[in-house]
Amino acid sequence: MNGSKKIYLGIGLVALLMIFIYWLMPKDTANASSQIESTNASAIIATSPGQQNQLSENTTPFGSVSQHDTQVNCQLQLNAANHLIVNEQTRNCFEYFLTQYGEKSLTQIDQDIKNYFTQSLPQPARDQAQDLWQRYLKYREELGNLKEPAIAKTDIAYYRAVFTSRQMLRQRFFSATEIAGLFGSEDIYNQYTLERMAILNNSKLSEIEKAKQLKALFDQLPQDWKANLEQLSKLDDLKQLTTSIKKNGGSAQELHDMRTNLVGHDATARLEQLDVERSNWKSNVTQYLDERQTILNSNMSDTAKQNAISALRSKNFTAPQDQIRVQAFESAKDQGQSLPFSE
């Protein structure tokens, strides 16, 4: 298999893994990741105005046809001695060029990025970037050679094995500092996700114990990650644990304790108020549908039935949005579908 095909497989493997591991990654995580990996601001110098103008003027030759209206995504950073600072921005730059594969050959991509470095970077950063790029290419090629673990994909051990093999592969091509810069943010999230899965899948823990451990795990995250992941992560944890408690016939107290451990007293109070509102809505809709069915089963004319149902709907649901909402339940019931109540 030639190198370009292996690069392609490497890209495919990364895409497959990211579908799994970034299943709750918020859209602005990339920004958070950049903040996590940032070095002391005083040690970083931005590209000079002259260099910025040059990069803007030379954007088109480096992009593919599908990227003709975009700027080159290469926010490379240098320190005061013009040494390359290896961080997620560096990796993003490499990946920007690699996404052109298919529209351009790997040889053309390689030449483009070298030309880009020549035009945009002073020495010694230029040579450092080119050397790192060559090693990154080899790393991506070897990703395509990694063997899939002989473990069911439903088992967390499968993903642990995949990430372990990737970490070992990185050590062949990069220093510890480079690994931290290129992959540090990804590793933080990967480790968090794997540990979170392990807690949720631990049958030896009660839902209350899971909530405590999930809260402790979340509290260990860097502050920037907490800000991005808090809502999505906790909502998903709440959904899974709540479903489990209800499925197993858990008590209201167990549900209360789980929520309190996971999101605190104030949020639990709001959730319990929402439970009351949902319960009232479910009761009202169920009663309305029963009365509506009685009308439909009566001997009245079709016109009389529709008038009676409209009057019944207006009586039970005064808010216009509720009247529209309940019609979705009417349709579901008429078609023999499950009623779309929120749980």
UniProtKB/Swiss-Prot annotation:
Which InterPro entries is this protein grouped with?
Answer: Lipase_chaperone (IPR004961)
Q: What is its membrane topology?
A: Single-pass membrane protein
Q: Which UniProt keywords apply?
A: Cell inner membrane, Cell membrane, Chaperone, Lipid degradation, Lipid metabolism, Membrane, Transmembrane, Transmembrane helix
Q: Which family does it belong to?
A: Belongs to the lipase chaperone family.
Q: Gene Ontology cellular component?
A: plasma membrane
Highest taxon of the source?
Bacteria
User: What protein name applies here?
Assistant: Lipase chaperone
Q: What does it do?
A: May be involved in the folding of the extracellular lipase during its passage through the periplasm.
Q: Which HAMAP family match?
A: Lipase_chap (MF_00790)
What the entry lists under Pfam families is as follows:
Lipase_chap (PF03280)
Lineage start: Bacteria, Pseudomonadati, Pseudomonadota, Gammaproteobacteria, Moraxellales
Organism of this sequence: Acinetobacter baylyi (strain ATCC 33305 / BD413 / ADP1)
One GO BP annotation is: protein folding
Tell me where in or outside the cell this protein is found. Cell inner membrane
* Transmembrane residue ranges: 7-27
Please list the GO terms describing molecular function: unfolded protein binding
Q: What is its main location?
A: membrane
